[in-house]
Regions:
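Unchanged
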Residues: 40-64, 73-124, 148-150
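Charged phosphate-binding loop/patch that engages nucleotide di/tri-phosphates or the phosphate backbone
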Residues: 125-150
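Conserved positions in beta-strands of structured domains
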Residues: 14, 65-68
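Conserved N-terminal beta-strand and adjoining loop/helix that marks the start
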Residues: 1-19
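Short polar/acidic secondary-structure junctions
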Residues: 25-27, 72-73
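A short gly/proline-enriched turn/hairpin at secondary-structure junctions
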Residues: 34-35
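Beta-strand scaffold of nucleotide-dependent catalytic cores
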Residues: 21-23
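A conserved beta-turn-beta hairpin within the catalytic core of GNAT-like acetyltransferases
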Residues: 27-31, 77
């Protein structure tokens, strides 16, 4: 069994110029606001993980759209995507987060509980082009097991 606890994803989900945020219930950002996300499961692609995590944590259905940023550290990586809002109203899972809600993006950026990294990601979002998922897949490879963002 592989160990995917070092591979994580988060998503910027906008609805009516409001960003989806969660208040974390654990870890180094306990009590702070961040964009929702989580770890990949074994044999799970990042876009599937993002859609699953956001649904589990907030009851919001999304579709992964583009890659905004990726952060590498010595012991992990974290990919940040945009995701299109499809349906649902935010409901916290009460396990990993105590709150889930949409907040005006300008209010989010000035909120004292927003994590520094989330603030930086939101500030940079829209200032530069994001990478879009390509339909390209090399011959002989299952498209469900391959992703290319350009």
């Amino acid at each position: 069994m592989s160990d995917n606890r070092y591979l994580s994803v988060s998503g910027i989900v906008l609805r009516d110029n409001k960003v989806l945020l969660v208040r974390q219930s654990y870890g180094s950002v306990k009590g702070l606001l961040t964009i929702p996300g989580g770890y990949l499961q074994e044999n799970e692609m990042p876009d599937d993980a993002l859609e699953r995590e956001i649904l589990e944590e907030t009851s919001i259905v999304v579709k992964t759209r583009s890659l905004v940023a990726i952060r590498f550290a010595l012991n992990d990586w974290w990919a940040i995507f945009t995701a299109d809002y499809i349906s649902g109203e935010p409901v916290p899972d009460k396990n990993e987060n105590s709150e889930a809600f949409f907040l005006d993006i300008d209010d989010a950026l000035s909120h004292p509980d927003l994590t520094y990294t989330t603030k930086e990601v939101l500030l940079q979002y829209g200032k530069k082009p994001s990478m879009q998922k390509s339909n390209f897949c090399p011959a002989g490879i299952d498209p469900k097991e391959y992703m290319l963002f350009m």
